[in-house]
């Protein structure tokens, strides 16, 4: 981006770097703002890492990260607080500098649930506990991420 003429890039699509297991995007907010580049955040569920269903077989994350996220999802289930809800709330409510977050689902009911989660208050104690469970796997990336 440093080598492109100013104004050439209007926005970027970031995925899996502003979610419960990875907040790397925060390190780049000033860079984008200084250049007038808008940010679209995507995949608050980290491509399925942060789901009760579990990580898809094709997911490129390393096993220790998959296992840490599975433990976090199990904890959330035990607490009666779906990790999907916490993940969507975290990605949409904590940082006003990130105005747009995209998520997808093949199930229309899940889309409606995700939309409703945005209007509910975020439980910061749950966020802290989940991030504690993920532990040293926070910000662990995989190829092409």
Task: Give residue spans per PLM region.
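Beta/alpha (TIM)-barrel catalytic core signal, keyed to glycine-rich beta->alpha loops juxtaposed to Asp/Glu
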Residues: 1-144
